């Protein structure tokens, strides 16, 4: 099972505050553990929402709103994508994360859908999705 581990933004991350060297070292050590355990698929920190945009959908209409966005509790500051056996294992890993912002922090864990979760998808569509995923993984492996 794949899980997205979402580091929630706060006022400091939205202000663009940089982690200290000690915080960076602690996070690097944690990421190293994930890699050595063979569970890390991806992981990145994100710039503040002031460097982003939102696209709102209403039928065929698209509306773009540039950041920053006011509600920091709805924003994310970073993520990991992990391959694990269960939600319980994901929780155990997340409990070991160094505090990502050095103060009040929150991390959300969400299971990622697989093609098997979509009962209305035809076999042809599932096969096409697998081919696209294989192509994506091959490109990622090339660096």
Regions found by a protein language model. Give the residues of each.
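Conserved, structured core segments of small domains
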Residues: 1-143
